[in-house]
Amino acid sequence: MNNWNSITIKISREAEEAISALLIEAGSAGVEINDSADYLNHEDQFGEVLPEIEQSELVDITAYYPENMPIVELKAEIEHKIANLADYFSLTGLSVTTNNLSETNWAEAWKKYFEPARITHDLTIVPSWTKDYLATGSEKLIRLDPGMAFGTGTHPTTKMSLYALEQVLRGGETLLDVGTGSGVLSVAATYLGAAEIFAYDIDEVAVRVALENIELNPGHEKIHVSANNLLEGIDKKADVIVANILADILVLMTDDAFRLVKEEGYLIMSGIIADKADMVIASAENAGFFLETRLIQGEWNCLIFKKTENREGVIGG
């Protein structure tokens, strides 16, 4: 058995994926997320008895670190990095606490919480260590290592991105995946028929994680991963651009996205908390896109925009 230290961050829901990525980059073996919305939005289809949960706008994100890592210094470093993100999401209610987990073999024990999850009609996320799960019918298996975080496919923003890709991909497309994280959307795009995928992330750790996950799946030769800040300096024209990142970051890329999306092509934007959806819509429409579809799950929005002169069938067209 090994001893572990944990750092738990209570923060606004919209910051969940960004903070998870920050904690992984700081050396965590993985993160655990406790969100009241997961219980409140759960459909009681199988007679489960769920705990009574008080609704909150905050989530608890817990990261686990080996005991030999200097937890006091690490906590201070993480607090400093979170403070630098204040322009992107609310820090109201923020708290950062630590705990020692004596004699806990967390590095292996946490894996029991991750099981294969059917995300869409055809796409199922399977943990990399699950070897005996077999696809049935039209089911496609996306193998990921959830311990790498950066999105495992089960978060509402990622789920809706996958639904959106199913909706717009017909086969043979060139796709740009901005802020690729785990690489899950790029892998899904290969299964859905995209001919060539270019995946970008500003974080070198995310680039490494994406490459490792992509190698676990067939079709990885179609995916090209590199470090880049959004779409700056990119000149590759695309049929589809997808980005599942913070709303305040999404609005910085709409002009570049319009420049790169081919006529009749699509821009998929997810990771958008409800009260920032109008801001993202305005930014994309000002760039020249039309809103075609709006997906909503709980407080999260996923927006599908189209670059077209024919406004028939688009929202407001």
Swiss-Prot record:
One of its GO terms (molecular function) is protein-lysine N-methyltransferase activity. The keyword Transferase applies. The keyword Cytoplasm applies. It catalyses: L-lysyl-[protein] + 3 S-adenosyl-L-methionine = N(6),N(6),N(6)-trimethyl-L-lysyl-[protein] + 3 S-adenosyl-L-homocysteine + 3 H(+). InterPro entries: Ribosomal_L11_MeTrfase_PrmA (IPR050078), Ribosomal_PrmA_MeTrfase (IPR004498), SAM-dependent_MTases_sf (IPR029063). Keywords: Cytoplasm, Methyltransferase, S-adenosyl-L-methionine, Transferase. It is found in: Cytoplasm. Pfam families: PrmA. SUPFAM superfamilies: S-adenosyl-L-methionine-dependent methyltransferases (SSF53335). S-adenosyl-L-methionine binds at residues 158, 179, 201, 244. One of its GO terms (cellular component) is cytoplasm. Its EC number is 2.1.1.-. GO terms for biological process: methylation. Methylates ribosomal protein L11. Belongs to the methyltransferase superfamily. PrmA family. This is Ribosomal protein L11 methyltransferase. It comes from Lactococcus lactis subsp. cremoris (strain SK11). The gene is prmA.
